[in-house]
Amino acid sequence: MKGFFAGLICLLTLLQPKPVNAQTDSACRFRISVLTCSPGDDLYSLFGHNALRIIDTIKRTDIIYNWGTFDFYDPDFYPKFVRGKLLYSLEPQILPGFLQEYQEEGRSVMEQVLDLSCEEKMEIKKAVDINMIGDNRFYKYDFLLDNCTTRIRDILQKNIKGINEPVPLVPAGTTFRDMIHAYLDQGSQPWSKLGIDILLGSKIDRPVTNTEAMFLPDFLMKGIDSAKVNGNSTVITKQLILDAKPRVEMQGIYKPLMIIGIICLVLFLISFLKTPAIITVIKFTDTLLVLVTGLIGLLILFMWFFTDHWSCDNNYNIAWALPTNFIAAFATWKRPQWIRKYFKVAVVLMGLLLITWFWIPQEMNIAIAPFCLYMFYRYIELSRSKKI
C-alpha cells in the first residue's frame, strides 16, 4: 500500500504543470508578423497602411490586428474629424477579409515575419490583448504622432529586448513636410499638396528623428528590415502575400503653380487697360480675392486655435491669408478712406512675407508665390485713391 501511495505521489508530481516552462511553450506557439500595405491612389490611402498579424499555431487562429478603423456612421463624424477629436480603434480581422480591400484596389501587401524569443512573443501578445480591452481599443488619431503605424512601432520597441536603432531611414534634415511631399508628388496630388501646405503650420518643418520617420508604413518596414538584436536581423522572412497592379502615373499638366501663375499674369496685364469693362472685372476680382483670402485666414485661425491638430499651429500662411480681409472685402468696391489705410498695412505685411520667403521657419508652397506677388501689387493699388 505504501508503495502504491508513493507511486501515486510520484505520478502526480510528474503531472504538475511547470509554470515557467509551460508559459514559455505557450508563448512559442505564436508567429508574429508586420503587414505593410502599399499606397493607394486616393488621398486617404496615399500613405499606405500597417497591421499586425498573430498566428496561434495551437489554436489555429490567424488574426490581423488593425489600428486603422473608425466609425464613419457616428453622427458627429465630420465635426470630430475636422476638430481632431475623431477616435480610431483597434479591430481584429481575419486575413481574407483584410486582404479583400487591397486586392480590389490593386495594392500589394508585404509580410515581415519577426524573429522573436518566446518571451518577446508573449509580451507582444499581452500588449495587444490589453489594447483590446474595453476603451483601450480607442485612441485619438494623429497622422504624424499616433496612427496605425506608430501603434505597431511602439509595441515592438517596448517589447523586443536589446533592439538597436535602425540605420538612418531618411537623409539628415528631412522634415515631416518633406516626407508628406514625397508621397503627394509620387501620387500626383499637387492640389492636395497645396491645400495641405496651406493648412499645416511650421511645427512640421523640423527634422524628424529616426523613430518619428516610422510614422509612415514604408518607413516602418524599412526600420524593421534594418533593426538588429544582438547583431541579428529582426526579420526571419519577408514575403509578398498580395501583389499589386502596376500603378498608372497621372502626370497632369494642370499644376497649381502654372494655373495660378497664368491667372495672376493675365489679371496683372489687363489691369493696365482702363476700359470700363476691364475696370469692373478688376474691381470684382479684387473683392473676390480679398474675400477668399479672408476666408482662408479664418480657416487657418480655426485650425490653429480651435482644434486639436497641433500640426496646424504657428502657421505663417496667415501673413498672406489675412483673416481681417473677410471684413475688408465688403468695403473693397467703394474703397472708403479707412480701407485704403487698411491696405497700406496689408502692403507692408505682404512685402515682409515676400522678402523673408526663404528664411521664415516654414516651407511655403511655391504655387502661392505668384498669387502673393499679384496681391502685393493689388494692395498697393487699393491703398491709393479710388482710381485703378
What is the role of each PLM region?
Residues 23-25, 56-61, 116-120:
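A short, structured loop/turn motif at beta-sheet edges
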Residues 130-330, 337-340, 348-388:
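Activation targets extended, charge/polar-rich intrinsically disordered C-terminal tails
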Residues 8, 23-27, 34, 136-138:
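Internal catalytic domains of large membrane-associated glycosyltransferases
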Residues 1-24, 387-388:
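Bacterial Sec-dependent N-terminal signal peptides
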Residues 49, 62, 111-113, 149, ...:
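Extracellular structured ligand-interaction cores
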Residues 71-146, 150-160:
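A cross-kingdom signal targeting lumenal/periplasmic-facing segments of multi-pass membrane
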Residues 28-106:
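Glycine-rich catalytic cores of cysteine/serine-nucleophile enzymes that process amide/ester linkages
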